[in-house]
Amino acid sequence: MKTFFQIFMAAALAQAASAEVKVTVGDISDKRTTGKFFAGLEIELKLSGPELADAKGIRTVVKDATDDTGKALKKAENRFRGDGFEELQKSFGGGFGDKKADEFQMKLEFENPPRAAKAIKALNGSVELLVPSKDPAAVITASVAKDAGKPLENATLKAAGVQFTLRKPGKEEKKGADFGFGGGALGESELGYVISDPKGKVASVEFCDATGKKLESNGSTSSGFNNSKTVAISLRDKPPADAIAKIYVVTEKSVVTVPLALKDIALP
């Protein structure tokens, strides 16, 4: 059962005007079981609004959630990303010119509610958006040709505790180098990087041409653990020789906060 909510954005910065963000509750997956695996409650949120067009990262902060039996619901631990920012994901069906092209989705995961619970009575918190246009320091640009193969030197990355190395196109990384990963050779239509980000400060990484236009991709693969990983991005076409990487880093000035207050979310 789907319920609809609309909330309004109060800008976190004085120079940022308020913007409307529509939040729709999508699919709800409720797996109440006594087992340790595949259990839990997953709530899909769909977001749309003008502020999202410039956003490069998103995360949710849940202050409290209570079901209709009065029990507090505990947010499930994200073993892969922790509480850091994530890249925005298009809603299924979006990106191909249909009505969902400007709609994004995210998921909230909670531990099992009681079997008697029929709804989430209240869910309070916030959605935080990384909007790089609010702070030039939030965007770091590097040349693949000039900077690949060595740790990127940058004050913002250093302050965030991030180590970042662009992979050399077509070159195979030495096993054990940098962050303990063995990297296989990149294909002629692939670009990649190696990152250690213990605080979850890097929201996303894009590869672009020299003019800043994002290179279209078919997806990515990654390996790693403990906030360190090796990533390969498969591009639709062979990347240009002057390709650049744009690294989007969370800074205090770049974050816009959307208050979140949802009520009476029916459970399946």
Identify the function of each model-found stretch.
Residues 2-10:
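Sec-dependent signal peptide recognition
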Residues 14-16:
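N-terminal signal peptide c-region/cleavage motif recognized by signal peptidases
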Residues 18-268:
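Alpha-helical, hydrophobic structural elements that either
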